[in-house]
Amino acid sequence: PIKSSAASDVYKRQDATIGKLGFGEKLLASGFQSVTTRTAGFATVSQAELTSASKLFGCILMFIGGSPGGTAGGIKTTTMAILLLTCAAVIRGRKSTECFGRRLAESNVRSGIAIVFLTFAIWLTGLFGLAVLEPDERFIDLMYEATSAIGTVGLSADLTPSLTRGSHVILMILMYVGRIGPITMALVFAGREDMQAKFRDLPEKRIMLG
């Protein structure tokens, strides 16, 4: 994607990874880096030498992942789009989430929010475990490894080989969850329906938010 490629180039401009490359080579390296973080796992530059800003930006791309219908990991681009569109609808005071002149199904919106929240909760739990087991490692590197695992990306900041067995177990669990978790959760939330809800209508209650 053009935007992510441009942002990646900005964050990596001072990196040792592409600092000596020509302008055209920098664009190619940045473009490939923004694409490979979606799930490809190939690296043309050293991930360990990326700056903290570049690694953080890479974590965002890895967490979002690619589009549905393929082998890409992450929460998927459509799920992230639903989340952003829902936020926009709330800000604009609209009752439903809209996109290109269509109203998105409420089941899609609820499933998308659930997928993002559950995936983030599992990722955060795994990252916390890594931080506890690896107190001497840089937190941004642990975050990069955890996000790459749950996003089934395959990139590494050259940290995984030196981790303890407990950390390896955490990363393996994140990989399994990332591979089957979001897809399975989407199918479960989309296909499961509470039969009792059809015959009851509970009173509405408003609570304070924010």
Model-derived segments and spans:
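Membrane-proximal intracellular helices of multi-pass ion channels
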Residues: 8-210
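Positively charged, low-complexity/disordered segments
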Residues: 1-7
